[in-house]
C-alpha cells in the first residue's frame, strides 16, 4: 500500500544474497546519501558523544569511523551482508569503539530491550521498501528499532522518502514517537541562480500538517534532497 516503487528497481534490496554479491563486486567504501560532515549538525544535536548508538544497515560506509574520530565512544554496526561485516571487522579490528555484527534489521533479538540511546538509519528502511513484502518488512524493522531504544532515545532516519510515503510507517501510535522532520540538500547542491527563497537554518524543522504531510506552501529547492526524520521515543512521564 505504501511502497514507493517509483524509486525502486528490479533488485531485492532486502535480500542478503544481493548485497553479498554487490560488496564482493565493488569492494571499497561507500556512504549512501550523505557524509558525516553533512550530517554532523544533526547527529551532534541529538546524540551526545557518550551515547550507545546502533548503526543499522552499515554496509561499507565510513560514517561510523568519522563519528569515532569526532569523539563518539560506542557504535554497534549491523548489516545483513556477511561480506560487508567481515570486510569492516578486518578494517576496524583495532578501533574498540566500533563493533560489527551480521544481522537482519527485521530480527535483532540478539539485543535486549532498551539497549541503545540512538539508532541511525541511512537508507536501510528505503532498501526494505524496495524489497518483497515491503510493508511487512518495514513494520518488523521499526518494531525492533522501537524495542531497542531506551525511553527518550532517538531513531534518526535519513531517506529520500517524503512524508507522504514515510509517515504512514513511522507515525503508528504503537511506537509512541515524537517526530521532527528536516530536509537536507544532496552533497554539492547549489541554489539556482535567481532563487528568491530565504536562507533557512539547517536545523530548522519542517512544520508538518495535522495529517503528517508537507505544508502546501513548502518549497523543495533540491528535488533530490533527503529528509531526516528524528523519532524520539517518548517517556511515560512525557505523555
PLM region descriptions:
Residues 139, 143, 163-207, 219:
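Conserved Class I S-adenosyl-L-methionine
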Residues 193-239:
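Core SAM-dependent methyltransferase catalytic element
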Residues 117-136:
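A short SAM/SAH-binding and catalytic strip from SAM-dependent methyltransferases
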Residues 151-159:
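Conserved beta-strand signature within the Rossmann-like core of class I S-adenosyl-L-methionine
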Residues 52-108, 143:
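Class I SAM-dependent methyltransferase SAM/SAH-binding core
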Residues 135-151:
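A short glycine-rich, Lys/Arg-flanked "PGG" loop and its adjoining helix->strand segment in the class I
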